[in-house]
């Protein structure tokens, strides 16, 4: 360092320059760290959006499956409601044989992400669960080869129609890809006819 002294370089300037270099390096390092964190968070948000979009499509498909089953079961109940003894227990079991909603149950911790649809989503699958238990109670009180009676048939038909209507609400809001459009329109028309027939048949009882 003798040559610095020989040219008259003040050590104070050198120290100041060194400190400024360290400060600039620190600022650049801090900025780089912020950029890395920002990029990581951005990538994470993109991943979450992709995963949620996939979940919406999966849940939407499951809702469609159950909605078709409920409107079909409702139609079977209506066809049997004129019988004096109502629907047979065998037909009731066959019509209301719903599978376990695997996608919904395995993603219960993500239900809150569906925002304004959360209540309807929980109500849809909750009503199906309640209906299963109702069918089990009816089975416990009816002979295996017997019928469930007109009142029980009407009650089950009303619950099935309500579930179908909730399903219609959900598929139009949770996920509505174009490749489902034709099937969704057919379902809406089928539900509209079922709702109109129900209201004409039971004008004072509404949809439940």
Regions found by a protein language model. Give the residues of each.
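Helix-centric, low-specificity signal for extended rod-like, repetitive segments
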Residues: 12-14, 35-38, 49, 125, ...
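An N-terminal structural lobe/cap that precedes and organizes the functional/catalytic core
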Residues: 36-40, 45-46, 52, 73, ...
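Membrane-embedded hydrophobic alpha-helical segments
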Residues: 1-47
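Interfacial alpha-helical end/capping and short helix-turn segments at domain and membrane boundaries
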Residues: 61-208
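Juxtamembrane membrane-water interface segments immediately C-terminal to a transmembrane helix
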Residues: 43-64, 68
């Amino acid at each position: 360092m003798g040559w610095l002294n020989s040219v008259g370089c003040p050590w104070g300037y050198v120290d100041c320059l060194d400190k400024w270099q360290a400060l600039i390096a620190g600022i650049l390092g801090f900025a780089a760290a912020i950029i890395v964190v920002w990029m990581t968070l951005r990538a994470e948000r993109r991943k979450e959006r992709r995963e949620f979009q996939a979940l919406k499509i999966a849940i939407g498909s499951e809702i469609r499956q159950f909605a078709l089953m409920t409107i079909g079961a409702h139609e079977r109940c209506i066809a049997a409601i004129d019988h004096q003894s109502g629907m047979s227990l065998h037909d009731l079991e066959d019509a209301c044989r719903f599978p376990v909603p695997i996608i919904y149950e395995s993603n219960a911790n993500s239900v809150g992400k569906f925002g304004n649809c959360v209540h309807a989503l929980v109500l849809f699958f909750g009503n199906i669960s309640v209906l299963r238990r109702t069918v089990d109670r009816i089975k416990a009180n009816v002979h295996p080869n017997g019928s469930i009676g007109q009142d029980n048939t009407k009650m089950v038909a009303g619950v099935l129609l309500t579930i179908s209507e909730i399903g219609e609400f959900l598929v139009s809001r949770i996920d509505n890809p174009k490749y489902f459009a034709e099937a969704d329109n057919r379902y809406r028309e089928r539900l509209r006819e079922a709702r109109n027939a129900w209201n004409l048949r039971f004008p004072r009882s509404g949809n439940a």
